[in-house]
């Protein structure tokens, strides 16, 4: 038990913690020096008052400092969602990552088991023959040789094991629900990140700015999804040159049609895997259009295009040429050789 944490818990209930105070608190948590009741007390004090950007940045900075880091190629980016939107859609961010890699942008994708979809990122990758429980050396090899890798959060953030039982017992959302996208082990400076709530996109963008990111889009779909939606408008908090601006994205401005929400609903992991394979084979669908929209945004964040329609064209070429499928096959081969 840490006596040093007690005054910080009390302070957190009354006022925002400074970044230094919050870093001290999370250092204690991640070292396993806090009791479960202390962990729960701190997390709920922060949630009840409302977490600040300084507190998010502090927790993320401590997590980053303690992670099993990997080296990534210059210009690598992350494409990730918080999960937890409860919508059960097809896995769009994972498919988008392979398309963007197929278009020539290195993708160091951070993720975990499913939160709300019936098939989360790790589950979708397993359907494609990709082993996700691999360490930093395999991740670095994949990034170097084929320009894409998947980093399973528990393999890179061992310190979170101290907090997981308390999170499970609390049974409610805490700031840990958004820390994953803020703690990429490859230290990427560019990312397309979905949030389960519109209220989170600005504070998450401001947190990434405080952590030194260069360019990021934090997005939330009007249908409640944690990505750019193909069903209508999406809201974006964009980080560039240290400033955050908010704007909207509509599928039509990327040259894509609007689809009904039912068209992007997922199923079992096997059904979602089949949809993923059909997408990579070039099949036209709402799923393809959703991936094209998100890939176009990612390519814009990466600096490869300046307009969404150009990003859609580049992404479509990555699919139809077989380049995206080749990335899937390459990652499956590298990870299978390592296990």
Curated annotation (Swiss-Prot):
Reported cofactor(s): Mg(2+)
Gene3D superfamilies, per database record: Nucleoside phosphorylase/phosphoribosyltransferase catalytic domain, Transferase, Pyrimidine Nucleoside Phosphorylase, Chain C
TM stretches of this protein: none
Superkingdom as given in the UniProt entry: Bacteria
Co-factor: note: Binds 2 magnesium ions per monomer.
InterPro entries with a match to the protein in the record: Anthranilate_Pribosyl_Tfrase, Glycosyl_Trfase_fam3, Glycosyl_Trfase_fam3_N_dom, Glycosyl_Trfase_fam3_N_dom_sf, Nuc_phospho_transferase
Catalyzed chemical reaction(s): N-(5-phospho-beta-D-ribosyl)anthranilate + diphosphate = 5-phospho-alpha-D-ribose 1-diphosphate + anthranilate
Presence of keyword Magnesium: yes
Binding site for anthranilate 2: 167
Residues at which Mg(2+) 2 binds: 226-227
Gene Ontology MF term list: anthranilate phosphoribosyltransferase activity; magnesium ion binding
Protein's GO biological process: L-tryptophan biosynthetic process
Positions annotated to bind anthranilate 1: 81, 112
GO cellular component: cytosol
E.C. number(s) listed in UniProt: 2.4.2.18
Swiss-Prot/TrEMBL keywords: Amino-acid biosynthesis, Aromatic amino acid biosynthesis, Glycosyltransferase, Magnesium, Metal-binding, Transferase, Tryptophan biosynthesis
Residues where Mg(2+) 1 binds: 93, 227
Disulphide-bonded residues: none
Binding site for 5-phospho-alpha-D-ribose 1-diphosphate: 81, 84-85, 89, 91-94, 109-117, 121
Protein's pathway: Amino-acid biosynthesis; L-tryptophan biosynthesis; L-tryptophan from chorismate: step 2/5
Stated family: Belongs to the anthranilate phosphoribosyltransferase family.
PANTHER family: ANTHRANILATE PHOSPHORIBOSYLTRANSFERASE
Stated role: Catalyzes the transfer of the phosphoribosyl group of 5-phosphorylribose-1-pyrophosphate (PRPP) to anthranilate to yield N-(5'-phosphoribosyl)-anthranilate (PRA).
Quaternary structure note: Homodimer.
Protein name stated in the entry: Anthranilate phosphoribosyltransferase
Organism: Dinoroseobacter shibae (strain DSM 16493 / NCIMB 14021 / DFL 12)
């Amino acid at each position: 038990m840490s006596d040093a944490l007690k005054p910080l818990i009390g302070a957190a209930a009354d006022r925002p913690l400074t970044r230094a105070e919050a870093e001290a608190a999370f250092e204690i948590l991640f070292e396993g020096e806090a009791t479960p009741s202390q962990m729960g007390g701190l997390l709920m004090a922060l949630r009840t008052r409302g977490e600040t950007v300084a507190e998010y940045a502090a927790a993320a900075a401590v997590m980053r400092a303690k992670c099993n880091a990997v080296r990534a190629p210059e210009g690598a980016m992350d494409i990730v969602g918080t999960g937890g939107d409860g919508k059960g859609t097809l896995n769009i961010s994972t498919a988008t990552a392979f398309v963007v890699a197929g278009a020539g942008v290195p993708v160091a994708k951070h993720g975990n088991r499913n939160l709300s979809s019936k098939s989360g990122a790790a589950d979708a990758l397993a359907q494609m023959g990709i082993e996700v429980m691999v360490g930093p050396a395999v991740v670095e090899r994949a990034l170097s040789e084929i320009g894409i890798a998947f980093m399973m959060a528990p393999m890179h953030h061992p310190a979170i094991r101290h907090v997981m039982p308390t999170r499970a017992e609390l049974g409610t959302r805490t700031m840990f629900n958004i820390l994953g996208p803020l703690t990429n082990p490859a230290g990427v400076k560019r990312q397309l990140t979905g949030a389960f709530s519109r209220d989170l996109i600005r504070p998450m963008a401001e947190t990434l700015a405080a952590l030194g990111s260069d360019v990021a889009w934090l997005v939330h779909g009007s249908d409640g999804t944690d990505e750019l939606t193909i069903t209508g408008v999406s809201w974006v908090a964009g980080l560039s040159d240290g400033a955050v601006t908010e704007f909207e994205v509509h599928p039509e401005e990327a040259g894509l049609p609007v689809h009904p929400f039912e068209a992007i609903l997922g199923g079992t992991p096997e059904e979602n895997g089949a949809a993923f394979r059909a997408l990579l084979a070039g099949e036209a669908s709402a799923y393809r259009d959703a991936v094209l929209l998100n890939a176009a945004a990612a390519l814009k964040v990466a600096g490869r295009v300046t307009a969404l329609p150009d990003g859609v064209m580049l992404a479509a070429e990555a699919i139809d040429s077989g380049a995206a499928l080749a990335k899937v096959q390459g990652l499956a081969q590298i990870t299978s050789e390592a296990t």
